Amino acid sequence: MMQRCLRLQKPLALRRGLHLAQVNSQAVATEAPEAEPLDAFERQYLKERIEISPFQRLFLGTGSSIAALLNPRRHDMIACLGETTGEDALWTILDTMQASEEGQRIMADKPRIHTSTIDFKYLETLPPDTFGAAYVKFLKDNQVTPDSRMAVRFLEDPKLAYLMTRYRECHDLIHTVLDMPTNMLGEVAVKWVEALNTGLPMCYGGAVFGAVRLRPKQRRAYLKHYLPWALENGKRAKPLMPVYWEKRWEQNIHELRSELGITVLNKA
């Protein structure tokens, strides 16, 4: 509790330093008074993370941004960009998680979204108007899998690493609740909602530069319908990171959208 109060009250740089000092102390097995014990995810992440200097972080951030701009299909570069530019936004997201009972449960449980952790056979038995059924339909219609997300490697703090992991693994769930496909137009619209909802710089970059690559017909639809809808939902929706999606499978998807302040776009 004391650590949580410190993080909420101290400036960003100071609270980050306090937490990283605790993490590093535990990583070398030295005594760290008042430090929270590391859980399984955090211990494993500290073994696998790649430590980089501030210069290397700047170099990777710049290089990955250029590579992602030239080729938006370079998911490895997009992932690198997210990790090297998103730390401040992730600290803010962590505060949002800790301010919500549902978010606190997520941070305690650290659930993962994979075919090995989600009972998709069960989701297929749910009524079609439930969130779980809509998620399965989204995966099938767009021919995507939850197992395709890249592992986080460059963030120092394991809690922030989990939040970035959570963001990546929940991306398709955001598509589902927004009723957006995975084509370029749908991805750009979702990125705007995610950018305004999370503050992650990579989401803003994906939204702005992704729109540049739209074809003329797509761009007209984007400017007339998709962009206004995305901006409205991004500003109005409740924080999406603290939503424990795995506990919402049986919930009526229309009720879920209403609870979160989300409206779907009429694509007709």
Swiss-Prot record:
Topology of this chain in the membrane: Peripheral membrane protein
Residues the entry annotates as binding Zn(2+): H171, D172, H175, E187
Pathway: Cofactor biosynthesis; ubiquinone biosynthesis
Transit peptide, residues from-to: 1-25
GO biological process, one term: ubiquinone biosynthetic process
Catalytic activity of the protein: a 4-hydroxy-3-methoxy-5-(all-trans-polyprenyl)benzoate + H(+) = a 2-methoxy-6-(all-trans-polyprenyl)phenol + CO2
Keyword Membrane: yes
Principal location class: mitochondrion
Gene Ontology CC terms, in alphabetical order: extrinsic component of mitochondrial inner membrane
Compartments, as annotated in UniProt: Mitochondrion inner membrane
Alphabetically ordered keywords of this record: Lyase, Membrane, Metal-binding, Mitochondrion, Mitochondrion inner membrane, Transit peptide, Ubiquinone biosynthesis, Zinc
E.C. number(s) listed in UniProt: 4.1.1.130
Cofactor(s) listed: Zn(2+)
Pfam families in the cross-refs: Coq4
Function: Lyase that catalyzes the C1-decarboxylation of 4-hydroxy-3-methoxy-5-(all-trans-polyprenyl)benzoic acid into 2-methoxy-6-(all-trans-polyprenyl)phenol during ubiquinone biosynthesis.
Oligomer status and interactors: Component of a multi-subunit COQ enzyme complex.
Entry's family note: Belongs to the COQ4 family.
Name of the protein this chain belongs to: Ubiquinone biosynthesis protein COQ4 homolog, mitochondrial
Organism field: Drosophila simulans
